[in-house]
Amino acid sequence: MANLVESQRLFQTALSLMPGGVNSPVRGWGAVGLTPPPLLVRGAGARVYDVDGNSYVDFIGSWGPLILGHAAPEVVAAVQETAARGLGFGASTPGEVDLAKLLVEAVPSLEMVRLVTSGTEACMSALRLARGASGRPRLIKFDGCYHGHADSFLVSAGSGVLTQGIPGSPGVPHEIAALTLSLPYNDLKAVKEAVRRHPGEIAAVIVEPVAGNMGVVLPKPGFLEGLRQLCHQEDIILIFDEVITGFRVAWGGAQALYGVTPDLTCLGKIIGGGLPVGAYGGRRDLMSQMAPAGPIYQAGTLSGNPVAVAAGLATLKALQKPGTYEQLEEKGAWLAQELARAAARQHLDLTVNRLGSLLTPFFTRGPVHDLEDARRADLQKFRQFFQGMLAAGI
């Protein structure tokens, strides 16, 4: 294991200043049995460096935004140039128009878009819009999927809620949690039954078109198409949370790859190039109901921040270069193949779920289609794998 003396010292100080010593639960690394986590000070390309001078090959990429790697020259240059002209104005800027135009052109469902500062904000705003436009209260989501930490989403959620083993939704009033119906991912029959039991009450169905927060779980053939058909029939607003998949699995996101167009889409991570940007958008008749054009309110002091927008634009323009997604597919396929080969050599049960450059190794036998399948994976083996990789500088 690498020398982490300075990381240990700083983490002990952090524990007295911040809950769990971190500003986001997944950074604590408690679920993988590692304390302290390395405190990082620098990144370049595929590598990151900690305060103790250790170097690691990084497969996290700031949890998704850094698809070009750390300190990508074109992104750094765009940020520096924009920051030199001002960090923010509290007024609209040309970059916001450029980013909105690029997003609308790229993502099939987007006719209009609103920039915000995080994926959480995008999802909570899209839900408010769906409820306001439909006049209905209830939400359908899926077990193990994570849509940020807004109250309505913290029911059978994924991401840190899942890995930290947090039960239910403490701090969320029962009356709010009761409006969220959480169903098994990939179970279209369960969705139809929930709609039947609550006629005229479901405002929206929100789904990660490729689940990423319980590990990567792909939609079964017909699942997304079935959701689209059902929502159309029942006048329910279908929301794709593409915070992870947007511009990761394909230029237009998972909806472009699968050919299924939702009513609203939530974006984040990659569209900010490593800085805080989120977005939600979709049908013009829905988005036109947002203030100031309509009565449904949402606002943000730093929404469309020029420096963050510049980072996002630079990242997306780089992704437009020919061959980018083919290269990501090639690298993802190679990594999945090598993981499977290594597991076979050690006689380990391993299922690798992958789409493009998104992948998860589950230490289990058989397919992983939902949260219950994911929970059957051997967590202790994953901890050993994680710790061994870190010791090897990965």
Where is each model-derived feature located?
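Conserved N-terminal phosphate-binding loop of PLP-dependent enzymes in the Aspartate aminotransferase
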Residues: M1-I394
